[in-house]
């Protein structure tokens, strides 16, 4: 199970962000694979796409591609929208605005873009790891939002 990630602001640069969100994760996955781990579950991001013009989504997409290349018997990519896990020690103004609108306008926002409980993401990751279904599986944000209030 991997939920490692940072922000460009926290890491200080795009290069440092890429080191944490791509290099560290690929290195950890490679070590796990070489040690005989048959499955890997990643908390990625809605919109992850190696061809994206958005740096964050591009790195997430490149990471997903790299993990697929490692040949895990079971690989699950969880792609939540904006994460709602309660207050953070640091201020993330854009995230706070997104959560404020997302929770108040929930019924007007397509399920794909609604904020997702960190508990729902953790539950989906745990279930995927325990099921260990062969192949590559993607759990999109809209299926995670259906479990809000249940997790």
Pin down the residues of each PLM region:
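A short helix->loop->beta-strand "cap" motif at the edges of active sites that frequently abuts
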Residues: 35-38, 71-73
